[in-house]
Amino acid sequence: MAHKKAGGSSRNGRDSDGRRLGVKKFGNEAVIAGNIIVRQRGTRWHPGANVGMGRDHTLFALTAGRVQFAKKHGRAYVTVVPAQAAAE
C-alpha cells in the first residue's frame, strides 16, 4: 500500500496583538478629569500643567479643559487648559 508520511509542523505562525498606543485626545479637544490623552512606552510626551502620568507613562487629564501640545527645551509637553480659562 502506498502511504504518505505525516507532514512536519511549522514553528512559526504566531504574533502578539498591537498595544493600541498613541494620542487619544488631540490638540484643542475637550477633556474631563481622568480622560486618557496619550498612551505611550516611555516619555515621548511629558506631562505639563493639569496632566498626570500613570505607572506605564500614560498621560491623563487632571482637570476638565482643552488639550494643548507644545515643544519646550527640546521636549514635547501635553497640557490641559482649564475650562474656565478657555471660556474667558
UniProtKB/Swiss-Prot annotation:
Alphabetized Gene3D superfamilies for the sequence: 2.40.50.100
Entry's InterPro entries? Answer: Ribosomal_bL27, Ribosomal_bL27_CS
Disordered: region residues:
1-21
Q: Which GO terms describe its molecular function?
A: structural constituent of ribosome
| GO BP term, example | translation
- Gene Ontology cellular component terms for the protein in this record: cytosolic large ribosomal subunit
Which keywords does this Swiss-Prot/TrEMBL entry list? Ribonucleoprotein, Ribosomal protein
Q: Which family does it belong to?
A: Belongs to the bacterial ribosomal protein bL27 family.
Protein name as annotated? Large ribosomal subunit protein bL27
Q: Which organism is it from?
A: Methylobacterium nodulans (strain LMG 21967 / CNCM I-2342 / ORS 2060)
